UniProtKB/Swiss-Prot annotation:
EC number per UniProt: 2.7.1.35
GO cellular component terms attached to this protein's record: cytosol
Organism of derivation: Mannheimia succiniciproducens (strain KCTC 0769BP / MBEL55E)
Complexes and interactors: Homodimer.
Enzyme class: transferase
GO molecular function, a single term: pyridoxal kinase activity
Family, similarity comment: Belongs to the pyridoxine kinase family. PdxY subfamily.
Name of this chain's protein: Pyridoxal kinase PdxY
């Protein structure tokens, strides 16, 4: 069994961060070591929440504790997502470096959550800069959305062609694999959900159904990153991981839409996450 250290947010009610990523990865046969960066009552897009940011020192202490019992060497990958403070970036990179020193084959997937004020997603001051200046260069896999693609590349991304160029710029910064979670308004089709995957072998474009929610569910990016990484540690190629993830996420979104829910319906879709009925394929474009 493969082991993934998942350093993300935690919500008591609903699904975001580790609550979105852990169960689906476990369904894929991966043992998840969930380390929370915040503990909130609910995700921030409700507009109000209670809870706390986990002190940065606790991240290092917990990693050290796992190492002291001799288990850190068995970590196959690290994923980081929503961070509660800029200082946590440093602690996460220290954790990544420690894991890789013990297991040089371990992967680091950075989901560079930088906030989306228009959607009510708020991150602390300095997190964006820490991700850009430190985390990106350490990542083997980077999974930005459109906003993060612009911020990390430093380029305007107003159309599909510019998105491709921005991906190339980001790959030159260190990540071998870049997965754009949602092309949004720069995609080719207004009525589809579109994603990109880029690595040394080329660039792939994938479309899946787009569901129109009254309120967009949160945690889809966390689910996306988690499922992609679970497939990778299980030995799948980037393309295989990309296609399975896209189909599994589509099943979750379809189920959530049919149940008219604001929160992702992971439990209702649990069998479809492992064995999706959906069968969309990626198309190589470069």
């Amino acid at each position: 069994m493969k082991n993934v250290l998942s350093i993300q947010s935690h919500v008591v009610f609903g699904y975001a961060g580790n609550k979105s990523a852990t169960f689906p990865m476990q369904l894929m046969g991966v043992d998840v070591w969930a380390l929370n960066t915040v503990q909130f009552s609910n995700h921030t897009q409700y507009g109000k929440w209670t809870g706390m940011v986990i002190p940065k020192e606790q991240i290092g202490e917990i990693i050290r504790g796992i190492d002291e019992i001799g288990e850190l060497k068995n970590c196959n990958a690290v994923v980081s997502g929503y961070l509660g403070s800029a200082e946590q970036v440093d602690e996460i990179i220290k954790a990544v470096e420690k894991v890789k020193s013990l297991n040089p084959q371990a992967l680091y997937l950075c989901d560079p959550v930088m906030g989306h004020p228009d959607k009510g997603c708020i991150v602390a001051d300095g997190v964006k800069e820490g991700l850009i200046n430190l985390a990106v260069s350490h990542a083997d896999i980077l999974t930005p959305n459109l906003v993060e693609l612009r911020e990390i590349s430093g380029l305007p991304v107003e159309n599909f062609e510019q998105a491709i160029e921005a991906v190339k710029v980001i790959r030159a910064k260190g990540p071998k694999t870049v997965l754009i979670k949602h092309l949004s308004k720069v995609g080719k089709y207004a009525d589809k959900f579109e994603m990109l995957l880029a690595n040394d072998e080329g660039i792939w474009h994938l479309t899946r159904p787009l569901y129109t929610f009254a309120k967009e569910p949160v945690g889809v990016g966390d689910l996306t990153a988690g499922l992609f990484l679970a497939n990778k540690v299980n030995g799948k190629s980037d393309l295989e991981a990309f296609e399975h993830m896209a189909n599994a996420v589509n099943e979750v979104m379809k189920t959530t839409f049919e149940l008219n829910s604001y929160e992702l319906q992971l439990i209702a879709a649990r069998k479809l996450i492992v064995n999706p009925v959906s069968s969309v394929k990626a198309v190589k474009i470069a």
